[in-house]
């Protein structure tokens, strides 16, 4: 049979019903196979027709499967053949006849379905018995098609196009599926004003990602549903266009345009009752464009200009500029409505409004302190995204995490059960032994197991009871939510009896039960309230900043910063005090919060602790000495090397890779940045530092603004080092600083120096300082050896020897490190490799005349 004039979906149904016969080992291809294939087709057209008539597709499928199972199975060997039955061919021919009589150029799947109602075999009888006849089906097809003819091979794609390629936002509002919208009244009012115009009544919402553009549409849908809009919009529906569904599966040229035209045709026929919402409006420009074909935006322009299409677009400012503004004809048909980022206070209001939705979804409770923390902490610490999206994400993730914890065993109970399993394994092993010690151990373990089993049973009982109470509370919340939706519907329908019953009877009763359930003590086994600490924990995981930095009293922590830094850096009290004061000023909030936490220029000779202080500062502030970006400025001696910091300009190799400085800070906004040997860099490089030091921001080569507000900038230099090396202990510090600053001012411009928080001098180390450093360095070596279970001991004479030999005023502490390597570490390494020192040994180091002696104690 020739099926050239069948649509692609119809051909697929015919192929599938043939495969079904082969799969079931049936010799004939019957109308029953055709009916089974139609009931399983993917477009949903047949299901829509059956629902329209009042049939039940699931019941039909069951009856068809029952009849298919009755057909005899025949094992067809290589010489056998499966053939179409006369009845099956008759049905297909009838479908062709019906299509021709209806004025269709192609036979569609609904025409095949209609032809089955004329069938006298079991397939036709099943349809008749379920109330599906040719008359009812013809009326349902007419209603589905809305007068359209099947004149293309993809005709089915144009049926009910809005339902297929769109989402009814107003219907979602009606069913209570949308979150409440808080604080966007001005933007919604502006959109309503534009929609109420006679011509070019098409607003486009422009704003950064995550500020709530789509939420404004949902708010408008809720207002339309509540009839809180002008009369011109009261009967409107908002349909969100799914551009992905429009494009998907459009194999042939012109098919995409056909689908879009069918959508626009339905909108036009609605006489202004449908408002089309296109999220990511810029996707329309160029979509569907092939050689000589028009893109989607050109199909919209005529209807937009005539006012036949009510359309709301949403896009970001960058994409609007890049795509929409370039097409002036499209841009002038839309009226921009700018959507700004809400303030922290507005975000808190938004979060309070949607709180119940998240509590209901995750079956947890959200404290108000968690809401405030989500808004304030996300604004302070997550700088590359926008409110309220980033705050909502924090609440959502914290709730999700708690939900997972609630569904698993409490930690205490889990540890108890693991201990029980461990004891059972030990008992099984000990029962194989017959000695007295094993018998005593079995007795003690049996007694312990008995106690633990009893404790585990009690805790399990309490845990299950607590879980049951939480599940009961969750069920009551769902009932309360549904009751409120029913109340809204009853009030709108003026069903006063039902509204009164819900408002004064059912809802108060559920609320009383819910309050009683929430007040029940769960014995501390389950934590169900999301708190400020949970939000802070999520922030900590996202950004890498330690949680205690945000929640512990920073006043107490920062008051002891000198003490903590002095444990690592010796002999630089003035430098430690200067950097501590600057950090305290920043953290106490009495300086500009838009600047870095601190910016310092460390001046001093080599080996006096400039870099070590920077590492110690990173360890104190971020609990990680490696939270440090070290940039060796001797690598930036040429003017063009500045591009390595912020990224290569457009058109150059490496443009898409970003810069060393900007990319590191984007990925980890909380770190100490060390510009080492800064005087060796080209002077033009300091021009980019001006905006970092002053505004706490820097724009990279791709136009992305990188936030430096949570970094500490440290620059080190050897300028004036010879003055500091030759400084006498009783010499006036201010005089020395003036002499050093003359060198500094000769190299750096005043506007650069003026933006630094502190210029700190590092003085040369004296013998007492070296002695303290010896103890620190040997302490580090002691920790390393302890990992191998080797104990290192040293007496006063060894410390004095190392301090004397390692002291060099010109080179600071670095010669000491080399001395310890040469005198101690090299000898220890040889002894360990030779087997003289092994795990469990104690190694004593003492001075013997003019050298160190290593003594090994077993």
Swiss-Prot record:
Positions of region (C-terminal): 765-858
Disulfide bonds, paired cysteine numbers: none
Residues covered by region (Linker): 342-544
SMART domains from the UniProt entry: AAA, ClpB_D2-small
Molecular function GO labels: ATP binding; ATP hydrolysis activity
Keyword terms, alphabetized: ATP-binding, Chaperone, Coiled coil, Cytoplasm, Nucleotide-binding, Repeat, Stress response
Residues that coordinate or bind ATP 1: 207-214
GO BP annotations, alphabetical order: cellular response to heat; protein refolding
Region of interest: NBD1: 160-341
Boundaries of every Clp R domain copy: 3-147
GO cellular component, one term: cytoplasm
Residue runs in coiled coils: 392-523
Binding, ATP 2: 604-611
Repeat 2: annotated span: 84-147
Subcellular location: Cytoplasm
Superkingdom to which the source organism belongs: Bacteria
Residue ranges of the region described as Repeat 1: 6-71
Assembly: Homohexamer. The oligomerization is ATP-dependent.
Note on domains (UniProt): The Clp repeat (R) domain probably functions as a substrate-discriminating domain, recruiting aggregated proteins to the ClpB hexamer and/or stabilizing bound proteins. The NBD2 domain is responsible for oligomerization, whereas the NBD1 domain stabilizes the hexamer probably in an ATP-dependent manner. The movement of the coiled-coil domain is essential for ClpB ability to rescue proteins from an aggregated state, probably by pulling apart large aggregated proteins, which are bound between the coiled-coils motifs of adjacent ClpB subunits in the functional hexamer.
Family per record: Belongs to the ClpA/ClpB family.
Known function: Part of a stress-induced multi-chaperone system, it is involved in the recovery of the cell from heat-induced damage, in cooperation with DnaK, DnaJ and GrpE. Acts before DnaK, in the processing of protein aggregates. Protein binding stimulates the ATPase activity; ATP hydrolysis unfolds the denatured protein aggregates, which probably helps expose new hydrophobic binding sites on the surface of ClpB-bound aggregates, contributing to the solubilization and refolding of denatured protein aggregates by DnaK.
PANTHER family: ATP-DEPENDENT CLP PROTEASE, HEAT SHOCK PROTEIN 104
The name this protein goes by in its record: Chaperone protein ClpB
Organism, scientific name: Rickettsia typhi (strain ATCC VR-144 / Wilmington)
């Amino acid at each position: 049979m020739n099926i050239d004039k069948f649509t692609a979906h119809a051909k697929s149904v015919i192929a599938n019903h043939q495969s079904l016969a082969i799969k079931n080992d049936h010799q004939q291809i019957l109308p029953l196979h055709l009916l089974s294939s139609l009931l399983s087709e993917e477009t949903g057209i047949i299901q829509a027709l059956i629902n329209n008539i009042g049939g039940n597709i699931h019941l039909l499928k069951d009856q068809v499967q029952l009849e298919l199972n009755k057909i005899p199975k025949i094992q067809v060997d290589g010489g056998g053949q499966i053939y179409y039955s006369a009845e099956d061919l008759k049905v297909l021919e009838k479908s062709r006849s019906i299509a021709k009589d209806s004025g269709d150029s192609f036979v569609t799947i609904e025409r095949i379905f209609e032809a089955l109602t004329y069938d006298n075999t079991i397939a036709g009888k099943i349809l008749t018995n379920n109330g599906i006849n040719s008359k009812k089906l013809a009326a349902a097809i007419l209603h589905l098609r809305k007068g359209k003819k099947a004149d293309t091979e993809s005709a089915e794609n144009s049926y009910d196009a809005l339902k297929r390629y769109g989402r009814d936002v107003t219907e979602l509002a009606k069913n209570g599926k949308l979150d409440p919208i808080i604080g966007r009244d001005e933007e919604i009012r502006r959109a309503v004003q534009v929609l109420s115009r006679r011509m070019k009544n098409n607003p486009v919402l422009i704003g950064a990602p995550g500020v709530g553009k789509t939420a404004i549409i949902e708010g408008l849908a809720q207002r339309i549903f509540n009839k809180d809009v002008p009369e011109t919009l009261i009967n409107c529906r908002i349909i969100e266009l799914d551009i992905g569904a429009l494009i998907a599966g459009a194999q042939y040229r012109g098919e995409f345009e056909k689908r879009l035209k069918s959508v626009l045709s339905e909108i036009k026929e609605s006489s202004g009752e449908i408002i089309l919402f296109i999220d990511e409006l810029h996707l329309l420009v160029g979509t569907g464009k092939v050689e000589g074909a028009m893109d989607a935006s050109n199909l919209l322009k005529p209807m937009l200009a005539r006012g036949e299409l009510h359309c709301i677009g949403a896009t970001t400012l960058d994409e609007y500029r890049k795509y929409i503004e370039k097409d002036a004809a499209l841009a002038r048909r839309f009226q921009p409505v700018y959507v700004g980022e809400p303030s922290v206070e507005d975000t808190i209001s938004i979060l309070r409004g949607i709180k119940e939705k998240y509590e209901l979804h995750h079956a947890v409770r959200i404290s108000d302190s968690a809401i405030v923390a989500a808004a304030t902490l996300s604004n302070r610490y997550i700088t590359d995204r926008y409110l309220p999206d980033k705050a909502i994400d924090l609440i959502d993730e914290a709730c999700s995490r708690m939900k997972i914890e609630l569904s698993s065993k409490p930690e205490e109970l889990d540890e108890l059960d693991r201990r029980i399993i461990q004891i059972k394994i030990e008992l099984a092993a000990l029962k194989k032994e017959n000695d007295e010690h094993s018998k005593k151990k079995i007795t003690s373990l049996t007694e312990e197991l008995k106690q633990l089993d009893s404790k585990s049973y009690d805790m399990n009982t309490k845990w299950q009871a607590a879980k049951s109470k939480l599940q009961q509370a969750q069920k009551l919340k769902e009932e309360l939510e549904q009751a409120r939706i029913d109340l809204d519907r009853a009030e709108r329908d003026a069903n006063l009896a039902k509204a009164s019953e819900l408002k004064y009877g059912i809802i108060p009763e559920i609320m009383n039960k819910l309050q009683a359930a929430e007040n029940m003590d769960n014995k501390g086994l389950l934590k169900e309230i999301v708190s400020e600490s949970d939000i802070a924990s999520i922030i900590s995981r996202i950004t890498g900043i330690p949680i205690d930095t945000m929640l512990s009293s920073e006043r107490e922590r920062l008051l002891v910063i000198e003490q903590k830094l002095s444990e690592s850096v010796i002999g630089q009290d003035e430098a430690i005090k200067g950097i501590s004061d600057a950090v305290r000023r920043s953290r106490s909030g009495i300086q500009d919060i838009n600047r870095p936490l601190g910016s310092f220029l460390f001046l001093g000779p080599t080996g006096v602790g400039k870099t070590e202080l920077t590492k110690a500062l990173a360890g104190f502030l971020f609990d990680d000495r490696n939270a440090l970006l070290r940039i060796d400025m001797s690598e930036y001696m040429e003017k063009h090397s500045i591009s390595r910091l912020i990224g290569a300009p457009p058109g150059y190799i490496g443009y898409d890779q970003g810069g060393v400085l900007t990319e590191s800070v984007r990925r980890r906004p909380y770190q100490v940045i060390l510009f080492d040997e800064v005087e060796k860099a080209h002077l033009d490089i300091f021009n980019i530092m001006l905006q970092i030091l002053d505004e706490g921001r820097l724009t990279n080569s791709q136009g992305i603004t990188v936030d430096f507000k949570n970094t500490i900038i440290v620059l080190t230099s050897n300028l004036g080092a010879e003055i500091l090396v030759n400084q006498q202990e009783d010499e006036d510090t201010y005089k020395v600083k003036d002499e050093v600053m003359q060198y500094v001012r000769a190299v750096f411009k005043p506007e650069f120096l003026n933006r630094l928080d502190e210029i700190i001098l590092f003085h040369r180390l004296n013998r007492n300082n070296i002695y303290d450093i010896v103890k620190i360095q040997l302490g580090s070596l002691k920790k390393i050896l302890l990992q191998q279970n080797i104990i290192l001991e040293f007496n006063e004479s060894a410390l004095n020897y190392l301090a004397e030999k390692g002291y060099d005023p010109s080179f600071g502490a670095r010669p000491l490190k080399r001395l310890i390597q040469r005198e101690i570490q090299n000898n220890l390494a040889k002894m360990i490799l030779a087997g003289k020192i092994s795990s469990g040994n104690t190694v004593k180091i003492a001075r013997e005349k003019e050298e160190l002696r290593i003594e090994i104690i077993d």
